[in-house]
């Protein structure tokens, strides 16, 4: 923000797909997120999305890195207080309407949306100490599901992933 880049930031922790969505919804030039994704906490990474909301290609990443390497981070990169950025308007919180639009789009993508299904089916959900709790449970509830159990030990975000060292739901041990 101190370098003249307009910043839109979620006011609370949000999962990766919301950054991709907000990038498109707000018509921004790019989206950036620091995330552990489905990796162990020591592998937190930097994800960059293009204006289309897709992760940038290897070629685009190389171009960005080449520009970064031209900078003297001590002389060329300005910093400022976060609140000063908010006050100046260079940092803006993403409004709740974007989150609501994201949830609605997720619901619209459901293959069973609007169909007659048993809404009391037992659903067990684990955010794996990530950031999916609020959007997943909100979406399920708005779709009418009522029997949702959240795994308490993995409910809150924790980048150390204390109960699941490799939080990838595709890995069988993560779901044990």
Model-derived features: where do they sit?
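Gly/Ser/Thr-enriched, mixed-charge loops and adjacent short helices
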Residues: 44-174
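N-terminal small/polar loop signature for handling phosphorylated ligands or for N-terminal nucleophile
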Residues: 1-43, 139-176
């Amino acid at each position: 923000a101190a370098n003249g880049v307009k910043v839109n930031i979620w006011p609370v922790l949000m999962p990766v797909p919301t950054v991709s969505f907000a990038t498109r919804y707000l018509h921004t030039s790019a989206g950036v997120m620091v995330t552990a994704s489905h990796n162990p906490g020591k592998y937190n990474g930097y994800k960059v999305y293009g204006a289309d909301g897709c992760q940038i290609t290897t070629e685009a990443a190389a171009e960005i890195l080449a520009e970064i390497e031209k900078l003297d981070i001590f002389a060329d990169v300005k910093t400022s207080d976060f609140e000063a950025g908010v006050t100046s308007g260079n940092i803006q919180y993403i409004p709740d309407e974007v989150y609501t639009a994201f949830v609605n789009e997720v619901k619209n993508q459901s293959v069973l949306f609007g169909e007659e299904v048993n809404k009391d089916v037992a659903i067990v959900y684990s955010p794996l100490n990530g950031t999916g709790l609020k959007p997943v449970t909100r979406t399920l509830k708005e779709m009418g599901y009522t029997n949702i159990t959240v795994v308490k030990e993995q409910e809150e975000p924790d980048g150390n992933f204390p109960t699941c060292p490799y939080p990838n739901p595709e890995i069988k041990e993560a779901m044990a």
